[in-house]
Amino acid sequence: MRVIVDPFGAWQHVDWATDHYAIDPRDESVIDDLVSNRVRIMLVLDVWDPASRTVYYKTEEDIQRYLSWVRFMVRHFKGRVAYYEILNEPDLNFAVPSGMPVPAYVNLVKQTVPVIREEDPQARVVVGAVPDTRFDHVRDWMWGLLNSEVMPLVDGFSWHGMYGAAPSEDARGVRQPDTPQMDHYWENYPALVQEITRVATANGFRGEYLVEEMLWRTRSEPHESEPYGFTDVSGAKYYGRAIIIHLGLDVTTGLAVVLEDIRPRSHAVIRGLSTVMAGAHPAAFPVGIQSEAINVKHFEFTVPSGEKLLAIWTDGAAVDDDPAIEATVTLPGLASGRVTGIDVLRGQEQQVNSSLQDGGMIIRGLLIRDYPLILKVSNP
C-alpha cells in the first residue's frame, strides 16, 4: 500500500519552523495495522512548503533540510516500511515554480538514496511517480529520468499510467484534449510499457516497475481535470483489464482508493483479482482463439501451485450490459487437467467443459465479454 504520512492534516505539509519531527499517533496506528496484516508499505517521501506549495530542492540548504526529514522518517519506520518513494509527481508545475526539472530531481535522488541506504539497508528506493503518461510533456520528462545516471542506484521506477484511460472508441476516456498527448493511448499503452522497461534496462536499471493511482471515476467522484463519466460497472471492467495488462507485463499494480460503499462492483473485481492472481507471474504458453469477436486480448500466467491461468476479454468500450460472444479456445500441449472459469465481476466460478484435440485441450462455446474471464487449468 502506498501512503503519505501527514501529521498536520494537510497533504504533504511539514512545519519547517520546528526543530524536531513527530509522527501523529493516528498515522502510527495506520502503519502498525498494515504491518500486522502483512501489507507491504510504500512511504512517499514528499513535502511541500505550506505557504507556497514549493518543493524544497532549489538550494543545498533546502536539500539538507529535506534529507534531515528523510533520515528521521526512515529511521523511525525501519523494518515496517518496505519501499520509500522520492517525491510524488515531481514534474508537476503549479502557479508557483514547484515543478522540478529532471536535473534537479536527479540531484535530489543522488543525495537521498545514500541516506535511505544508511538508515535501512533492506528498504527499496523508488523514483519517478510521474503523472499521466498519456501527455507528451510527461513522457519527455520521464525519458529524461530513465536515461539519467540514477537508474542503477534505485530499486523501483513508478508512473501513473491510467487516469480514466479507455479505448479510442470510448469518449469517456478523453482527458484534456487540447494538451498534446499520445494518439490511441489505450491501444499503444502496452508498447509504451515495453519501451519504459527497455530504456530503463539499457541504463542499468535492474529493479521493479510499478504503476500507481489507476482509477476510473464515476459522476459521484468527479474531478475537474480527469474523466469521470464511467459507471461502477464499466469502471470495474477497466480496473479488471488494467490489473491483468500490468500483471501480464510484469508491472506491480497500484490503484487509487476505491470505496466499497460507492463502487461495489469495482471493489468486487479488485478484491476478486487480488485473490485469484495472488502469486501469479506472466508465463506465455500457446493459446488459439477462434471467434467473431474483434480485438480479443489475452494474457497467460502461472501460479506457485503449477496451475496455469488464462485471462481473456474483448477490448472495446466497456458497457454495463455486454451480451457476450462465443469463442473456441485451444490450448496446445495441455493434454489434461481441469478447467475452471472465474468471473470476478459476478463473483462466480464453475467448471468449464473441455475435450482433447490434436494433443491439446479445446474449449468450445466459451462466452467472453468486455472484462477479463479467468480460466484456471489445474494439474491433472
Regions found by a protein language model. Give the residues of each.
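Well-ordered, non-membrane alpha-helical segments in soluble/globular domains
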Residues: 20-28, 66-67, 105-111, 138-144, ...
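Glycoside hydrolase catalytic-domain groove-lining segments
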Residues: 21-24, 162-224, 240-254
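C-terminal beta-strand-rich structural cap/linker in extracellular carbohydrate-active enzymes
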Residues: 353-380
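Aromatic/acidic polysaccharide-binding cleft in carbohydrate-active enzymes
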Residues: 211-296, 304
